[in-house]
């Protein structure tokens, strides 16, 4: 069953890539049906930071793909196996999980592309201004607030994860005690690294950190898949005895009624959050060098397809390794004696 599901995922990714060639992708038709009065539209354009004509972008297609893939892929990918475990410990649950992943990936890619198309139609350079021109100025402040709150919590989550990870690394490598404290590490990283990166005007420079981040995600995917295939965590495996009973593989122990049917929405929420990068859609359109709809759609489809594939590998391999005992941060399931897990 899980082989069929993985095949479905790969085919869907190929199909998603094919949408890059569809000229109508986006929201051009929807926008054209509900245009604002000419004077209001002019006012919106005057308020746009970029004016009626956007300046030339500086990021090429490959840089944009790397950057967007890194924006999409985050630490949330390591929670996906637990999303399946939330409603089932059966390997058959991988099929509906695959359907959810593919469907939500396609919807997310389409809506991301639509935001870029709206920016093109109205010659604007921000999500809020595109919304005002497409839907109406009255609700634009609400959208701006939602984006601000979402990105604030995204940055907060990023800082917390980095603080937890690097404080542990500091302890194990003998760095100064100041760095052993999670709060100190969060403050240090946020001040010295995260904030300067966010203030960069030329996002093309982020492609190097994006490559590093994507390399980390790719390593995690390869590691998790390797441990599933080599059987190190099955009963009798190399690391089986090292981990707590509550962390060991568990399959087909749940009885009907043990889990609410609504528990599947835990996975839905995780996948929906995993694909969220839409607050950056207008930025990617503005930053694209010699921007065209075809180039933008290529960036979107390649980045979302790659992300969906990484999500699928980690979700599949992680769940197939630990089943119903998959933890919210799947790396915590692995033995502290597993060197490859420590590197991850």
Q: Over which residues does each language-model region extend?
A:
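Cleavable N-terminal signal peptides of Sec/SRP-targeted secreted and luminal proteins
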Residues: 4-18
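Transmembrane alpha-helical segments of multi-pass small-molecule transport proteins
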Residues: 8, 67, 71, 101, ...
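Membrane-interface "cap" regions at the ends of multi-pass membrane proteins
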Residues: 16, 21-82, 87, 109
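Membrane-interfacial loop- and helix-cap regions that link adjacent transmembrane helices
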Residues: 56-57, 62, 113, 119-144, ...
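Residue-level signature of the transmembrane alpha-helical core
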Residues: 69, 98, 102, 145-148, ...
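Central hydrophobic cores of alpha-helical transmembrane segments in multi-pass inner-membrane proteins
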Residues: 75, 105-114, 190-199
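Extracellular loop-to-transmembrane helix junctions
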Residues: 81-124
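Membrane-water interface regions at transmembrane-helix termini and the short interhelical loops
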Residues: 83-87, 191-212, 287
């Amino acid at each position: 069953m899980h082989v069929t599901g993985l095949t479905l995922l790969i085919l869907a990714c190929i199909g998603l890539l094919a949408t890059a060639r569809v000229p109508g992708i986006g929201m051009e038709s929807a926008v054209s049906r509900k245009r604002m009065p000419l004077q209001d539209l002019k006012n919106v354009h005057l308020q746009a930071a970029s004016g009626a004509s956007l300046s030339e972008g500086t990021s090429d297609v490959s840089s944009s793909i790397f950057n967007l893939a890194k924006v999409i892929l985050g630490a949330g990918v390591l929670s996906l196996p637990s999303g399946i475990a939330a409603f089932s410990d059966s390997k058959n649950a991988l099929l509906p999980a695959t359907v959810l992943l593919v469907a939500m990936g396609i919807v997310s890619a389409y809506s991301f592309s639509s935001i870029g198309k709206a920016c093109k139609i109205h010659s604007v350079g921000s999500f809020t201004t595109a919304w005002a021109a497409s839907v109406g100025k009255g609700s634009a402040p609400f959208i701006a607030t939602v984006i601000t709150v979402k990105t604030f919590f995204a940055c907060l989550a990023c800082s917390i994860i980095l603080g937890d990870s690097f404080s542990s690394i500091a302890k194990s490598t003998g760095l100064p005690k100041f760095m052993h404290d999670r709060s100190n590490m969060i403050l240090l990283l946020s001040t010295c690294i995260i904030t300067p990166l966010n203030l960069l005007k030329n996002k093309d420079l982020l492609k190097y950190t994006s490559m590093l981040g994507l390399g980390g995600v790719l390593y995690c995917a390869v590691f998790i898949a390797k441990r599933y295939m080599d059987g190190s965590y099955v009963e009798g495996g190399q690391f089986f005895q090292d981990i707590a009973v509550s962390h060991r593989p568990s399959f087909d122990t749940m009885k009907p009624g043990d889990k609410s049917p609504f528990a599947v929405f835990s996975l839905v929420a995780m996948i929906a959050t995993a694909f969220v990068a839409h607050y950056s859609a207008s930025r990617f359109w503005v930053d694209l060098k010699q921007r065209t709809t075809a180039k933008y759609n290529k960036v979107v489809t390649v980045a979302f397809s790659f992300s969906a594939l990484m999500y699928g590998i980690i979700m599949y391999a992680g769940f197939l390794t630990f089943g119903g005992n998959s933890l919210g941060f799947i790396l915590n399931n692995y033995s502290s004696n597993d060197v490859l897990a420590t590197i991850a």
